[in-house]
Curated annotation (Swiss-Prot):
Organism: Bos taurus
PANTHER family: ANGIOTENSINOGEN, SERINE PROTEASE INHIBITOR, SERPIN
Function description: Essential component of the renin-angiotensin system (RAS), a potent regulator of blood pressure, body fluid and electrolyte homeostasis.
Post-translational modification as stated in the protein's UniProt record: In response to low blood pressure, the enzyme renin/REN cleaves angiotensinogen to produce angiotensin-1. Angiotensin-1 is a substrate of ACE (angiotensin converting enzyme) that removes a dipeptide to yield the physiologically active peptide angiotensin-2. Angiotensin-1 and angiotensin-2 can be further processed to generate angiotensin-3, angiotensin-4. Angiotensin 1-9 is cleaved from angiotensin-1 by ACE2 and can be further processed by ACE to produce angiotensin 1-7, angiotensin 1-5 and angiotensin 1-4. The disulfide bond is labile. Angiotensinogen is present in the circulation in a near 40:60 ratio with the oxidized disulfide-bonded form, which preferentially interacts with receptor-bound renin.
Protein name: Angiotensinogen
Localization in the cell: Secreted
UniProt keyword annotations, A-Z: Disulfide bond, Glycoprotein, Secreted, Signal, Vasoactive, Vasoconstrictor
TM annotation in the entry: none
Length: 476
C-alpha cells in the first residue's frame, strides 16, 4: 500500500487530471497557479537587485510576563474587514485553498478518528491543520519545504520556481476563508458567528526566532504569542504552565490541552481555535433531555429546538439522513444522522470523504422541526502523531530544515491543534409546548443519539469543522 501522504497527493492530482488533458499542447498552467510564485516574483527571488540582509531575530519573553487578554470582538472585526474589499482573484484563490484543505481534512480526520473509541467524540478543524502545516512551510527550506508542499497537495517537484507554493498567498487566503465564515451574519445579526485563532510559540530559553516568520502568522492567527520557558527540567510542569498561560490569556476552557512535552524540545507550536455559533430561530428547551450515548447509556443535556425550511436528504440505501441548517447567509451546519446508532462508524467512513460536497447536492428543502443538543465540544491533537500515522514521522523531525523560523538547530516537539466548538440557540428558553407554524406539516428530526457534523462556508467551499458528537458537552 502506498504511504498515506502520497495517496493524498495522488487523490488531488487525479481530481485535477482534467486540467492537463484540456490543456493539450498549450503552455503549461499549474493547476493551482493562483497559489504559486509568479514569474516576476521568481525573477526577484533568483536575481535580487541588492544583497538581502539577514532576517531580524528576537528572543521570546518569559512565559510569566504579563499578557493582555484576547479581545474576541476585535478579532471578529479584523476578520470582517479582511473580506470587505475582496477581488475576484482573492475569492478564486480562497476556493483553491478550500479544495486543498478539504482533501487534507478528510484524510487526516480518518487517521485521527481511527484512534477514537466508539463512545468518544471529537471535533476537528481542517483549517487549523492546513494553516499550521502552511506555517511550517513558510518557515522551511528544501528539502523540507518541498516535502511539505507535496503533503499540502500542490505538485511542484522538479518544475522550477513558478511551481513553488507561495506560502504567504496561502496564509492570506486562509484569512479570507475565516473572514468569509464570520462576515456573512453582519454586525447587527443576533446569530453572529465568532471565530478566534491564537497561536502560542513556546521556546527554550535563549532561542531566537526570526521576525518575518512570526509576522507571517498574523494572516491566519491575528494573535501570536511567542513565550520562553524551561521545557527540559520538568516536562509535566512546563505543560501545566503553558495550559495555565493560554487559559489566562484566552479565557477559553480547553481542559488539559497539553499533557506533557518532550524534554529535548526547543519549540512547541500550538494553535488554539474557538468557534461560537448561534442557531437563528432556535430556542433552548426547558430542563435537560436524554441523549443516548449507546443503547444502554444516556446523559442529560440541554436541547435546542427550532422549526423552519431546511434542506434534507434521507439516504435509505446507506441508512443515513442529512439536515442542512443555515448558520448565516453563507455558512451551513450539516448534521449527519445514522438511521441505526451502531452504524455510526460506517456512516462516518462513507460520508467524510472527497465526494462529500457532491453528495450534499442531493438535499432538498422541506419544513422540519429539528431538536438537537446544545454543543460544547473540545478536542486537542498533536500533528506529530498524525504525521507519524500518515507514514511521515520525520517531516517535522530533528532533520527538518526550518531555517526561516530560527538559525538554531530546532527540535520541534508537540504541534498542537486545540478546538473549542460551541453551538447555542439565539433565542430565549422555549415554553413546554410550542405551537407549529401554519404551513406544510413539518418533518420531526431529533438528534438524541450520536451523529456527525460539518460546518461549511459556501463561497470558498471550505469545511471549517468536522466532528463526531457522542457526548454533546464533552468531546475531549
Amino acid at each position: 500500500m502506498a504511504p498515506a501522504g502520497l495517496s493524498l497527493g495522488a487523490a488531488i492530482l487525479c481530481l485535477l487530471a482534467w486540467a492537463g488533458l484540456a490543456a493539450g499542447d498549450r503552455v503549461y498552467v499549474h493547476p493551482f497557479h493562483l497559489l504559486v510564485y509568479s514569474k516576476s516574483n521568481c525573477d526577484q527571488l533568483e536575481k535580487p537587485s541588492v544583497e538581502t540582509p539577514p532576517d531580524p531575530t528576537f528572543t521570546p519573553v518569559p512565559i510569566q510576563t504579563k499578557s493582555s487578554a484576547v479581545d474576541e470582538e476585535a478579532l471578529w472585526e479584523q476578520l470582517v474587514r479582511a473580506t470587505e474589499k475582496l477581488e475576484a482573484e482573492d475569492r478564486l484563490r480562497a476556493s483553491e485553498v478550500g479544495l486543498l484543505l478539504n482533501f487534507m481534512g478528510f484524510h487526516m480526520y480518518k487517521t485521527l478518528s481511527e484512534t477514537w473509541s466508539v463512545a468518544s467524540g471529537a471535533v476537528f478543524s481542517p483549517v487549523a491543520l492546513f494553516s499550521t502545516l502552511t506555517s511550517f512551510y513558510v518557515g522551511a527550506l528544501d528539502p523540507t519545504a518541498s516535502r511539505l508542499q507535496a503533503f499540502l497537495g500542490v505538485p511542484g517537484e522538479g518544475q522550477g520556481c513558478t511551481s513553488r507554493l507561495d506560502g504567504h498567498k496561502v496564509l492570506s487566503s486562509l484569512q479570507t476563508i475565516q473572514g468569509l465564515l464570520v462576515a456573512q451574519g453582519g454586525a447587527s445579526s443576533q446569530a453572529r458567528l465568532l471565530l478566534s485563532t491564537v497561536v502560542g510559540l513556546f521556546t527554550a530559553p535563549g532561542l531566537h526566532l526570526k521576525q518575518p516568520f512570526v509576522q507571517s502568522l498574523s494572516s491566519f492567527a491575528p494573535i501570536t504569542l511567542p513565550r520562553s520557558l524551561d521545557l527540559s527540567t520538568d516536562p509535566n510542569l512546563a505543560a501545566e504552565k503553558i495550559n495555565r498561560f493560554m487559559q489566562s490569556v484566552t479565557g477559553w476552557n480547553m481542559g488539559r490541552a497539553l499533557t506533557a512535552v518532550s524534554p529535548d524540545s526547543t519549540l512547541l507550536f500550538n494553535a488554539y481555535v474557538h468557534f461560537q455559533g448561534k442557531m437563528k430561530g432556535f430556542s433552548l428547551l426547558p430542563g435537560l433531555k436524554e441523549f443516548w450515548v449507546d443503547n444502554t447509556t444516556s446523559v442529560s443535556v440541554p436541547m435546542l429546538s427550532g422549526t423552519g425550511i431546511f434542506h434534507f436528504w434521507s439516504d435509505s440505501q446507506n441508512n443515513l439522513s442529512v439536515t442542512r441548517v443555515p448558520l448565516s447567509a453563507n455558512t451551513y451546519l450539516l448534521l449527519i444522522q445514522p438511521h441505526h446508532t451502531p452504524d455510526l462508524r460506517k456512516v462516518e467512513a462513507l460520508t467524510f470523504q472527497h465526494n462529500f460536497l457532491t453528495r450534499m447536492k442531493n438535499l432538498s428543502p422541506r419544513a422540519i422541526h429539528l431538536t438537537m443538543p446544545q454543543l460544547t465540544l473540545k478536542a486537542s491533537y498533536d500533528l506529530q502523531d498524525l504525521l507519524a500515522q500518515a507514514k511521515l514521522p520525520t517531516l517535522l523531525g530533528a532533520e527538518a530544515n526550518l531555517s526561516k523560523i530560527s538559525d538554531a538547530n530546532l527540535r520541534v516537539g508537540k504541534v498542537l491543534n486545540s478546538v473549542l466548538f460551541e453551538l447555542k440557540a439565539d433565542g430565549e428558553q422555549a415554553p413546554e409546548s410550542v405551537p407549529q407554524p401554519a404551513g406544510p406539516e413539518a418533518l420531526e428530526v431529533t438528534l438524541n443519539s450520536p451523529f456527525l457534523l460539518a460546518v461549511l462556508e459556501r463561497s470558498s467551499g471550505a469545511l471549517h469543522f468536522l466532528g463526531r458528537v457522542s457526548r454533546p458537552l464533552s468531546a475531549e
